[in-house]
Design a protein with these regions (language model features):
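Enzyme catalytic cores with a strong preference for nitrogen-chemistry domains
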Residues: 1-170
């Protein structure tokens, strides 16, 4: 019996590759995030920095079953939309297909006749791009995670200061 090591024949890309989609004479650049890549904010951020007009997430959520995993996974796409001010189109083979606008609002969701996301089927959507964000980079897209690091540093300093004050009182 042979075991294939994790990541056996996968080679990471060296640059962001965007797909072009021409609609009505306009060309839209699409940043593709495969499955759980939407969990990693830096991947979406680099696509936006490279000129992506929207993100497309193709995902296999079938292994979650009909639990909350598909909705929790979709929440990451909401974060990516807000962080980068780009719409996100999601296509899941086992739940949660739809689109999220650049403000993080779920604008359309593929549901069956019973109102559930867990079924086989398909649909089409019209995605709106808000002009005020079109081709502009959000603060997060331009500057990244420095605010998170700064907040973590301030929280750590506050904790150490508080512990020091407790030690002085005792």
């Amino acid at each position: 019996n042979k075991f294939v090591p994790v990541g056996g024949r996968f080679i990471p890309g060296e640059e962001v590759c965007l797909m072009n989609l021409t609609v009505g004479g306009s060309v839209y650049r699409i940043g593709s995030l495969i499955c759980y890549e939407d969990v990693f904010s830096n991947l979406a951020r680099e696509s936006a920095r490279s000129g992506a007009d929207l993100f497309f997430v193709a995902t296999n959520n079938a292994w979650y079953g009909e639990e909350g995993g598909a909705e929790q996974h979709a929440a990451h796409s909401v974060l990516r939309a807000v962080e980068n001010r780009r719409p996100v189109m999601r296509a899941g083979n086992g739940g949660w297909s739809g689109w999220i606008d650049s403000y993080g609002t779920v604008r359309d969701l593929l549901l069956d006749a019973e109102g559930t996301i867990y079924f086989r089927g398909g649909g089409a959507y019209t995605i709106e791009q808000f002009e005020e964000w079109s081709r502009q980079q959000s603060y997060y897209t331009r500057h990244g995670d420095w605010f998170v690091a700064l907040s973590g540093g301030l929280a750590l300093m506050s904790l150490l200061f508080g512990l020091h004050q407790l030690k002085l009182r005792s």
